[in-house]
């Protein structure tokens, strides 16, 4: 929740192909877009991924809600995105592994990944996630 990175996050999310790929729909008008991103950062655990001081990606842990729309304690949804010029370098795998290593025990992390997104599936597998059903994967922190 570092507001010092807000400008860098806004710049990262200016890449529409990136935001569309992860299902993040933001307002087109700049002022509304910045406010929406600010709200998103405030409501979730957002960690930026930096390379040589530049923000090249982000990892998000969000509260997980069950089928009835009720928040489930100790369950989180993992979301992540990385600038396309940084793909296939192990950067996101490393970032997620670092985050998982500092999480407390007895947490379940869910991730939604399109079945056609093989790169992202490989990241999840390398980070210990197991395929659940449909587009859902999960990892239990013991």
Q: Predicted segment positions?
A:
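Acyl-donor (CoA/ACP) binding surface of acyl/acetyltransferases
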Residues: 1-19, 46-142
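Conserved GNAT-fold acetyl-CoA-binding loop/helix
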Residues: 17-37
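Short loop/turn motifs at secondary-structure junctions and domain boundaries
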Residues: 38-43
């Amino acid at each position: 929740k570092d507001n010092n990175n807000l400008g860098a996050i806004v710049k990262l999310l200016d890449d529409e192909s990136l935001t569309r790929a992860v299902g993040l729909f933001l307002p087109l008008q700049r002022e509304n877009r910045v406010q929406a991103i600010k709200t998103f950062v405030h409501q979730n655990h957002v960690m930026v991924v930096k390379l040589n001081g530049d923000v090249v990606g982000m990892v998000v842990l969000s509260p997980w809600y069950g089928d009835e729309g009720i928040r489930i304690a100790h369950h989180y949804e993992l979301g992540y995105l990385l600038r396309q010029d940084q793909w296939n370098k192990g950067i996101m795998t490393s970032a997620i592994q670092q985050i998982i290593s500092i999480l407390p025990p007895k947490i379940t992390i869910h991730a939604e990944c399109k079945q056609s997104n093989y790169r992202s599936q490989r990241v999840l597998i390398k980070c210990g996630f197991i395929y659940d059903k449909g587009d859902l994967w999960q990892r239990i922190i013991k």
